[in-house]
Every structure is written in structure tokens, then in C-alpha cells.
Amino acid sequence: MTDKKVIRLRRARKARLKMHELEVVRLCVFRSSQHIYAQVISADGSKVLASASTLDKDLRDGATGNIDAATKVGKLVAERAKAAGVSQVAFDRSGFKYHGRVKALADAAREGGLEF
């Protein structure tokens, strides 16, 4: 693995350990060069309560790797989380910088009713 990826994974591991100690539901984000994925994971980490990505049929038609697509994913995951009875989450950015697509997804999820 490259140093950049190793450093990102180390940041992610440290953040996830803190969230695990607090035992909170988390909104986990992963971004690739072409897509972005979001999952709401239970406090013990054993179950995915809600998920959304640019691979969903609703979102696949438009562009999938830009800020607009991330905003749509954020709104969709917030709707699905609220339907599952989740309103408060911890934001797990998976070691990615809070910038660009990751920030757009977080802002849209907040607008959709999730509290971080």
C-alpha cells in the first residue's frame, strides 16, 4: 500500500476506536474515484441500518463522482436512516479529509435531519 493510503487507514482506525468506545451509531462514508458510499452502522458495529450510494438505481443515471452526486447520497441516506428510527449519528469519514464530496454528503445528511 502507498504511504498516503496507510496514513488514511491509520486515521480511520483511530477514529473508529473512539466511536466504538462511545457506543454510538455511526454514519460511515467511503469514496472512490467514481462513486461514493454511505452506511449507517449500529452502535456495536454488527448491523447496517441504512445505506445509500451512487450505485443505487435512483442516482446511477446522472454523474456519480462529483459533489452533486454526494449531496444526493447524503439526502437519501438521511431519509433511510430516519425511516429506520435513527436520528443521531457520529460521522465516520474513514480517514478522508472533510472537504469536497465528503463535506457535501455530511451537509446534505444534516439538512435531511440527521444530527451529528
Swiss-Prot record:
What InterPro entries has UniProt attached to this entry? Ribosomal_uL18_bac-type, Ribosomal_uL18_bac/euk
Pfam families the UniProt entry points to: Ribosomal_L18p (PF00861)
- Any single biological process term in GO: translation
A GO molecular function term, named singly, is:
structural constituent of ribosome
Q: What CDD domains is this protein classified in?
A: Ribosomal_L18_L5e
Gene3D superfamilies per UniProt: 3.30.420.100
Superkingdom, taxonomy of origin:
Bacteria
User: Does the entry feature the keyword Oxidoreductase, yes or no?
Assistant: no
Report keywords, A-Z. Ribonucleoprotein, Ribosomal protein, RNA-binding, rRNA-binding
Q: Which GO terms describe its cellular component?
A: cytosolic large ribosomal subunit
Q: How does it assemble?
A: Part of the 50S ribosomal subunit; part of the 5S rRNA/L5/L18/L25 subcomplex. Contacts the 5S and 23S rRNAs.
Family membership noted in the UniProt record: Belongs to the universal ribosomal protein uL18 family.
What is the protein's known function? This is one of the proteins that bind and probably mediate the attachment of the 5S RNA into the large ribosomal subunit, where it forms part of the central protuberance.
In terms of NCBIfam families, this protein maps to: L18_bact (TIGR00060)
Q: What is the designated name of this protein?
A: Large ribosomal subunit protein uL18
**Species this protein is from:** Pseudomonas putida (strain ATCC 47054 / DSM 6125 / CFBP 8728 / NCIMB 11950 / KT2440)
